[in-house]
């Protein structure tokens, strides 16, 4: 317990520091003390204060919300399919969410406030299809089959998304940076709607944590302990869909955060989901803040999409983990 408390305090302190440093980084550097003044004593006549509050604060909120949502979604996904390689981007949830948003935009049905609902529905439907296909055959649903079906269907759905973008130039121009996983150009309307979806996912995740802990012992053991396996998995899927939908609607399909974060927390603290889930939210938010800072400063004055940085780090980690699993 002491170790858990210490790790939690350290990560919260790092996150607090990140929240102060992050708004100061950009084309115009603003000192941390000015950032604090803007937060605590906002002056509408001060140019730096306006830059921080009106332009950079929404981006900070987007990074925190997206990182926390992806971190918790990854932890839930790994728990429900019992596979440490489980990740929303790899298993197709992000691809399904992106296809739903892009298709709606191409048909003229998209509106920013409704984007989280579209993304959640698309991600949930594709992941449900993955689970159904993975359940086929004598061996039933296994972690390996889920991963393979997820990778295959993710590639298939991504190709459909690419085809829509090639055929519809207007949608391509509107979605190009969003599809790369970008935190720029955020607005409070979309963030506010997405926050409700994230909150619903977080509440469900915390409620399901004890049942998911018992599910790790095996379906039969969990049933013997009074856990409804089907209900737990169904509500976990709903929580994952809400979290991924919120994250994708804000920043596009950012990958590998959900893979890295639960691994870090497990190694440092515990696999107990009652501890893992809240810490995954904290570490996910911190990780995405760091990734976005690097993306914005690595090739100044140019900016990379945040999703590019997470993929550059996450893809090699995924390959290493997969290699160790197959040994």
Question: What is each stretch, according to the model?
Answer:
Residues 1-327:
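Alpha-helical transmembrane segments in inner-membrane proteins
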């Amino acid at each position: 317990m002491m170790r858990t408390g210490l790790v939690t305090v350290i990560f919260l302190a790092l996150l607090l520091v990140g929240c102060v440093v992050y708004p100061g980084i950009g084309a115009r550097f603003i000192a941390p003390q000015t950032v604090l003044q803007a937060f605590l004593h906002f002056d509408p006549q001060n140019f730096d204060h306006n830059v921080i509050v009106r332009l950079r604060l929404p981006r900070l909120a987007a990074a925190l919300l997206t990182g926390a949502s992806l971190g918790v979604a990854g932890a839930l996904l790994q728990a429900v399919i019992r596979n440490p390689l489980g990740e929303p981007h790899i298993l197709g949830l992000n691809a399904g969410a992106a296809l739903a948003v892009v298709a709606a935009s191409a048909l003229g049905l998209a509106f920013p406030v409704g984007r989280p609902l579209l993304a959640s529905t698309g991600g949930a439907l594709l992941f449900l299809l993955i689970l159904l296909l993975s359940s086929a055959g004598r061996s039933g649903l296994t972690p390996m089959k889920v991963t393979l079906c997820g990778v295959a269907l993710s590639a298939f759905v991504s190709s459909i998304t690419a085809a829509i973008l090639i055929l519809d130039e207007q949608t391509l121009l509107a979605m190009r940076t969003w599809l790369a996983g970008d935190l720029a150009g955020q607005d409070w309307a979309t963030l506010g709607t997405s926050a409700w979806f994230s909150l619903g996912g977080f509440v469900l995740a915390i409620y399901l944590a004890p049942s998911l802990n018992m599910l790790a012992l095996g379906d039969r053991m969990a049933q013997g302990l009074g856990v409804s396996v089907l209900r737990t998995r169904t509500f976990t899927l709903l929580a994952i869909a809400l979290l991924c939908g919120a994250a994708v609607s804000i920043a596009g399909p950012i990958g590998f955060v959900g893979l890295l974060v639960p691994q870090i927390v497990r190694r440092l603290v515990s696999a107990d989901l009652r501890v893992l889930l809240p810490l995954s939210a904290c570490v996910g938010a911190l990780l995405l803040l760091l990734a976005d800072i690097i993306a914005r400063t690595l090739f100044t004055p140019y900016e990379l999409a945040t999703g590019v940085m997470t993929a550059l780090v996450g893809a090699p980690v995924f390959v290493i983990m997969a290699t160790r699993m197959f040994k």
